[in-house]
Amino acid sequence: MNIIPRTSLIIYLKHMKHERQIRKYGHIVHSNRQRKYVVMYINEADADNIVHKLMQLKYVHDIQGSPYKYLKKTYEKEKHEIQ
């Protein structure tokens, strides 16, 4: 079984009524009606194409990528903590 690398996008919409239309681009895991955003998981291989298609939609205000792959995942004690 292969694990497909996925990434999350935070998509800010102008109106939440368009949430249903963007379901075809990925898997929606969270939506906030007050702040008008949707958190969606997509395949990393298709990320560039999907972001390009989403930005062309009139009702998409902004798209932010997940910072997870840039975070440090192994934690070690810092030099000042050892002493």
From Swiss-Prot:
It comes from the Bacteria. It holds the Pfam family DUF2129. One of its GO terms (cellular component) is cytoplasm. Its main location: cytoplasm. Keywords: Cytoplasm. It is found in: Cytoplasm. Belongs to the UPF0298 family. This is UPF0298 protein SERP0712. It comes from Staphylococcus epidermidis (strain ATCC 35984 / DSM 28319 / BCRC 17069 / CCUG 31568 / BM 3577 / RP62A).
